[in-house]
């Protein structure tokens, strides 16, 4: 189990959730064998990519707002934190010899303390998963992909009242534009940031259901 955690670089919060949900989990032998084959394939692909050196150019700039920051999915108190950013460290690189340029921006302030050493550690993880997902992406028209990272310490929490409607303080950690030519996403919590980034990248690279033909799918379901 620890080896699996190390491979996917999961933090303690995610590990606890996995332990909770997979405890006593049962599935048939055929499904287990199929899953094992898939996991082995993914492991070997990640292992091969992990040995690749990524080249990037670093620039440091002052804070400049961006459209995605106005999203209602970002809590107001975290927006205030982001707007107090002192420096933005931007790493520019290309993946798999593609025409897509990747911009990874770390927002550094008293609310988001990310040292250069930490940035480089995170950068390697991010580029590894992007390079892996690029092997499967269906969106060939994406020109640029910009990832904004603000490591707020504010965690998600459940409302005190069971009848309250869940909002951005309870369930959201990121926002993204799905299948856009100018791809963009923002990760604004330190909590489970890497797991959430993988999820958002699947939206950005059209690896989700957004490109499905729902009319055809509905027709097949009614047959």
Model-predicted regions and their roles:
Residues 195-208:
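Active-site recognition of the HExxH zinc-binding catalytic motif
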Residues 66-181, 190:
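Auxiliary, metal-adjacent structural segments of Zn-dependent hydrolase domains
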Residues 185, 189-196, 218:
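Extended, charge-rich low-complexity interaction segments
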Residues 134-137, 205, 209:
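Eukaryotic basic, amphipathic alpha-helical target segments in cytosolic regions
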Residues 209-223:
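Post-HExxH zinc-binding segment in Zn-dependent metallohydrolases
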Residues 6-95:
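Long, contiguous juxta-domain segments that are non-catalytic but functionally important
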Residues 1-5, 12-13, 98, 223:
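Compositionally biased low-complexity segments enriched in polar/charged residues
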């Amino acid at each position: 189990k620890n080896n699996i955690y190390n491979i996917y670089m999961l933090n303690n919060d995610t590990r606890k959730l996995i332990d909770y949900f997979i405890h006593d989990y049962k599935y048939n032998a055929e499904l287990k064998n199929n899953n094992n084959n898939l996991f082995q394939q993914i492991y070997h692909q990640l292992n091969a990519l992990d040995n690749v050196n990524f080249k990037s150019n670093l620039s440091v700039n002052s804070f400049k707002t961006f459209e995605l920051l106005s999203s209602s999915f970002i809590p107001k108190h975290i927006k205030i934190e982001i707007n107090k950013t002192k420096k933005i460290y931007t790493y520019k690189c290309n993946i798999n010899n593609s025409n897509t340029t990747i911009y990874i921006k770390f927002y550094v302030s008293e609310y988001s303390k990310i040292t250069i050493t930490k940035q480089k550690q995170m950068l390697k993880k991010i580029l590894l998963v992007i390079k892996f997902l690029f092997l499967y992406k269906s969106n060939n028209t994406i020109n640029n992909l910009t990832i904004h990272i603000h490591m707020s310490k504010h965690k998600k929490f459940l409302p005190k009242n069971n009848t309250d409607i869940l909002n951005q303080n309870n369930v959201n950690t990121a926002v993204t534009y799905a299948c856009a030519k100018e791809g963009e996403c923002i990760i604004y919590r330190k909590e489970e940031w890497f797991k959430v980034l993988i999820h958002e990248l699947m939206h950005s690279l059209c690896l989700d259901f957004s490109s499905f033909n729902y009319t055809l799918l509905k027709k097949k379901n009614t047959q």
